[in-house]
Amino acid sequence: ILSHFNIDELDQVEWVKMFSDVFRIAYLDRPKQKYEDSLELILSKDYAKKLFHSLNESKASKRTNAELNGEWIADIGHTTDLSASYNDGNVISFTQTIGPLMGSKVASDGLGFLYAVTLGGYLGDYKPGDRANSHISPTIVTKDNGFYLSLGAAGGSRIITAVTQVISNVIDKGMRLDKALEKGRIYHVNDTTEIENHDGIVWEFQKDEIPYIGICKFEAKTL
């Protein structure tokens, strides 16, 4: 969907509106991904073009802007993401989560890890061979048949939007990876677009320029 926009030419207001619209339509489409032909559908450029044109038929959000109550800062976390590269050129992107409150609190002798407890919401809904729906998104980007970028994130449903925006900052705006990671991000949820606004984030617009945003302090804790 993003390939149909000239992202490098957008100002910040246009950028926020564009990503908000795209995230909304993409999240509405996610339930279709558990069907047998879901991979073919996800990779289809024609289907992406169809979704792009559907953006003109609906608006991303309808609420007026407002300060969101409190800060969204996770005090604890249970997801680990890492990327690693090796001398021989191999690269991995890895995301592992065990679920809240130390997972199942069960471990097997000698194995050294706790078992996860994150599939409770899926029980009875899947048949053998199906994969549980998840937001974790370990990602490897290639260019000219070679490695270009590896990344992922922790953060539940914000993972997908964060990874997408960082990749776009690198590819579409030509940023270095560290600068792309530092840029403020948005997150669309429940017909409201949340704008990251913690210390160090600078936006070049006033919140009333985008009528459907919420200003929110959300950030990942560094351990």
Question: What are the functions of these language-model segments?
Answer:
Residues 88, 130, 163, 172-218:
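Extended C-terminal subregions enriched in glycine
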Residues 25-33, 188-194, 222-223:
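Short, conserved secondary-structure transition motifs
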Residues 71-75, 127-133, 217:
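Short Gly/Pro-enriched turn/cap motifs at secondary-structure boundaries
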Residues 85, 90-149, 157-160, 173:
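Active-site rim segments in enzyme catalytic domains, especially the processed small/beta chain
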Residues 77-79, 110-112, 135-137, 145-147, ...:
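Active-site lining segments that contact anionic ligands and/or coordinate catalytic metals
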Residues 4-97, 111, 214-215:
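Internal maturation/activation junctions in enzymes
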Residues 1-3, 153-175:
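Alpha-helical support elements that line or immediately flank enzyme active sites
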Residues 14-21, 46, 77, 110, ...:
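Generic recognition of stable, solvent-exposed alpha-helical segments in well-folded globular domains
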